[in-house]
């Protein structure tokens, strides 16, 4: 029986390729985490203005990716929509299309360090301030969660 080494499965990556991808993705996530976990971040970096003051939340070209050992999964890639004050908005779509990741991005609860919101803006209006959640430090988000925003996830228990 002859074994042909020249045929390569399109869905297969070598251990060497996997290590290179993992190394690059670790570098990317470490850089993002380093920026996020800085001390004394000036408010100018995360306090912003709403495009429409009638909204309580604005998703603008949001990109949330998962950096794995075998590549990058673009779970949410370019999502934009508004949530007007006093209104209920439903997000509907097929399983795996990014509904939960979108809501986790708003709460800054995406599983880090592999999951990161890498682009766009999520503007959240507390009434006193407008925060770009993508750039808001973890310490500030912890104060916002529960006091100004909360979420009931599809599987609470």
What residues fall within each predicted segment?
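ABC transporter nucleotide-binding domains
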Residues: 1-157
């Amino acid at each position: 029986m002859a074994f042909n080494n020249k045929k390569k499965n399109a869905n297969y990556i070598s251990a060497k390729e996997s290590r290179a991808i993992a190394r690059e993705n670790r570098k990317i996530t470490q850089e993002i985490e380093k920026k996020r976990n800085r001390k004394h971040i000036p408010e100018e970096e995360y306090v912003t203005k709403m495009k429409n003051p009638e909204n309580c939340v604005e998703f603008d070209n949001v990109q949330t990716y998962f950096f794995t050992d075998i590549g990058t999964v673009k779970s949410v890639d370019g999502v934009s929509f508004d949530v007007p004050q006093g209104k209920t908005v439903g997000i509907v779509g097929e399983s795996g299309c990014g509904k939960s990741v979108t809501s986790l991005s708003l709460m800054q609860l995406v599983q880090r360090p592999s999951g990161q919101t890498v682009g766009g803006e999520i503007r959240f209006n507390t009434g006193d301030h407008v925060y770009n959640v993508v750039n808001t430090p973890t310490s500030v988000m912890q104060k916002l969660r529960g006091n100004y925003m909360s979420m009931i996830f599809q599987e609470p228990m």
